[in-house]
Every structure is written in C-alpha cells, then in structure tokens.
Amino acid sequence: MAIATIDPTTGITLKTFDAHTPEEVENRIARAEAAFRSLQNTSFEERARWMHKAADILESEADEVARLIATEMGKTLTTAKYEALKSATGMRHFADHAQRYLSPETPVPASEVNASNLHVQFDPLGVVLAVMPWNYPLWQAVRFAAPALMAGNTGLLKHASNVPQCALYLGDLFARGGFPEGAFQTLLVEGKDVIPLVDDARIRAVTLTGSVAAGSAIAEAAGRNIKRSVLELGGMDVFIVMPSADIEKAAAQAVIARLQNSGQSCIAAKRFYVHEDVYDRFEHLFVTGMAEAVAGDPLDESTSFGPLATERGRQDVHELVRDAREKGAAVQCGGEIPEGEGWYYPATVLTGVTEDMRIYREECFGPVACLYKVSSLQEAIALSNDSDFGLSSSVWTNDETEATEAARSIEAGGVFINGLTASFPAVPFGGLKDSGYGRELSAYGIREFVNIKTVWTS
C-alpha cells in the first residue's frame, strides 16, 4: 500500500511512499528496544544537549517546515510556522525541566515508615508507541516525543497517513540532534496495523490522539495487555459569554476560537453559550466576523484559514450542517460547499440548534459554530456538562464569583477565563469522559511514561 501526500487545495497527489513491510516494522521495534538499553543510562545533561540541538535545527528550518505542513494538511503558512516554533519551544522546555520533574522525592521522613532511607524515583518504561493525528502534525508528536525521550524512553511514531513527510521529518530530526540510532523512529503503516503493535510485548506503553473510536480500540488492546496508555480524544468545547464580559473582545476571540486550524482542533470552541442580555450584540459581531473570514490558499498571506485536510472530513462537516438545516436550524452565514477545486468549507454559524440534530452532540471538525442563548451562568454550565466530552472550555466574564463558579463546576480538563483554550509545555493538558484520560505536557505528562519506584532501606 502507498501512503500519499495529497494537496488539500487541489486534491492532487504530490508524493507517495511505500508502507513499511512487516519485516521493516519488526526491525524498527528491535532497534527501539536496543536503543532503550543505551538511552536509559544516559544523563539528563546528555539528553538535554541533544534535545536543544534538535530544537536549534527545527528553528533554523522553520520556514521550510511550515511550507511542508501547509502543503500536507492545509493550515495557513503563518500558523504552520507558529506550530514549528512552538514545537521547538516545547522541546527546549523538557530539555530544561525534565530533570526537575523527575528528580527523586521523599514523600515522608524515612523514620515514619521504619526506614533509614526512603525515596521515590522515576525510571523510564522502555519503548513507547505514539499514534498521532494530522491536525497538528508537528506539535502533537513533539509533545509526546520530547518528554518521552527526556525521561529516557524510546519512541515509535505511527502518524496519520496523510502527513507522511511531517512524520519522516520528525524521525530524522531527533537523530540529527544526536539521540542514539533507533531512539525515535517513524512507522509508515495503516491504521489496521496499530493494534498488533500495542499487542507487542516489547512496546511498554501507548499514547493516542484521535477519535473516540480509535481511542476505544487502543484502550481495549492496552487493557488486554495490562499496558500503560494515555488518550487525548475529541472535544465539544464551550465558549460562554456573560454580560460583564468585554463583548467586542469576546466576539473577536470567538471567531479565532472557532476558525483556528480551519476548525480542525479538539480544543476549538464548538458550542457558544451567550447570555440573553448581550446575545443580540454578540451574535451580530460574531456572525459578521465569521462571514468576513476568508478561506483560501494556505500559502497566501491574505488567507484567514485554509481548506479542510481531507475530502472525507469536508463531507462529514457538511453532512452535520445539512442535517441541522433540514431539522430547522438557521444558517446565519456559510453552510454550502463552494465551487472549484480543493476541500474548502466556509465559516458557518448555526442558530436554533436542537437536541434532535446530530451537531448538537457530535463533534464537528470544521469551521462551524453553534450559537445558543442562555439566561444564566448556571444554565450555560448545565448545557456544557450535558455532553459526552470534557476537554476544555473558555468563559468570558469580569465577575470573579462567576469565574470561580465556572472553574469549579464545568466538567472539563481545563477552564480558561477570558482567554482561548491553548496548550502550553509547562501546563497539563487532557480531558475526561469521552475526551480521554491521562495528561500530556508538564510534570504530569512526563510522569505518565515512567515507573514510579519506591526505594526503602532498612
């Protein structure tokens, strides 16, 4: 089977790669296992030196890498370069802080547990498999790779099949930085080949960012093998606007929140709950901003957002919009597939969305916003929590009591007050319910793939 780069602006295949044979996959697993025996005995200082060098290389090649990302999956050149530089920043963060995150700890004085010496240490697990998506082809993989490698693990990356060049670039990047041969490798395989990898005893843990269906399959396989796993799945993130908020700022940020990455982000806001006292004003500003956003060539600096990454993805988005329209939702802007080549979809705002519509509960991975009127913060929170997902949320209020209540009551992995949901290297990222389990980034993320070992001395 060939794995291809297809230009989402034209649908034309740009480059193809042969999928790895079973023998090639076996060789890569064996190399990863052999590399672990070496890497686990290196010092934090050595690994940090290699990681910083890899970050140096990435920064020096940021323009080239941005063009690669934009060409493979369609995000604008500006956001692609930002992703490349953010990835380098994440690499430097773990190079600088991994030793602190994983330094031995003494939970209580040794005498309290009848010991002369007591400490807890954090040992690497071994080979870790990462199954990563196409929407942030560099950042998603780096936020796994950087902490895993700095902890002393080795990594195998099974990337999405439509971003093979990004995957291969990452496979080379860490080797160019100085990490031992086999420490981080890319597997060009199909999705059906993932479960046998999870079943392989040499792979000690697995992390996946992707759909609920894919996460469920990984969780089942990992559970069957009593194997560590971390899942970052879908999101139905909310954007709540209360009367005390700066409405002009909130509306402008709401456009960004929905259109980031052409709406193809788990943490892109999808449900907008606006208090009735400011609803009309917000709706006018928001719909105007969405309607003015330009979908176009990601390499053109005037473009607001690019095409969707796949033809199937665009069709899925349009089917959700069509279902809502047929059941009575009003389309305030957008809502139609444009003529011409490329997998473009316009910025779309729906009102009058009801529970019988698929988009009410299903994640829409594209530039479509559902706008709702609420009478109180409590109603907004109740609606927010009435979802199978719980990844993150954004709440706009200048009332401290409201902010505190939202932070306490919203069922999500994150609550952002007067700001957009984002991921930062130093801050844990993840969700609950169907949005997954475990955490990425920060001290919490790096500790997902270590053995927490108690050392007690009589």
From Swiss-Prot:
Its EC number is 1.2.1.3, 1.2.1.4. Aldehyde dehydrogenase able to oxidize various aldehydes such as formaldehyde, glyceraldehyde, butyraldehyde, glutaraldehyde and benzaldehyde (in vitro). Is likely involved in the oxidative D-xylose degradation pathway, catalyzing the oxidation step of 2-oxoglutarate semialdehyde to 2-oxoglutarate. Is able to use both NAD(+) and NADP(+); however, shows a preference for NADP(+). Does not display succinate semialdehyde dehydrogenase activity. Pathway: Carbohydrate metabolism; D-xylose degradation. The active site is at residues 232, 266. Belongs to the aldehyde dehydrogenase family. It is an enzyme of class 1 (oxidoreductase). The gene is aldh. It catalyses: an aldehyde + NAD(+) + H2O = a carboxylate + NADH + 2 H(+); an aldehyde + NADP(+) + H2O = a carboxylate + NADPH + 2 H(+). Induction: Is induced by D-xylose. No significant levels of expression can detected when the cells are grown on various other sugars such as L-xylose, L-arabinose, D-galactose, D-tagatose and D-glucose. Monomer. It comes from Paenarthrobacter nicotinovorans (Arthrobacter nicotinovorans). GO terms for biological process: D-xylose catabolic process. NADP(+) binds at residues 134-135, 158-161, 210-211, 233, 363. Keywords: Carbohydrate metabolism, NAD, NADP, Oxidoreductase, Plasmid. The keyword Transmembrane helix does not apply. Pfam families: Aldedh. This is Aldehyde dehydrogenase. GO terms for molecular function: aldehyde dehydrogenase (NAD+) activity; aldehyde dehydrogenase (NADP+) activity; aldehyde dehydrogenase [NAD(P)+] activity; NAD binding; NADP binding. InterPro entries: Ald_DH/histidinol_DH, Ald_DH_C, Ald_DH_CS_CYS, Ald_DH_CS_GLU, Ald_DH_N, AldDh_AldH, Aldehyde_DH_dom, ALDH_GabD1-like. It comes from the Bacteria.
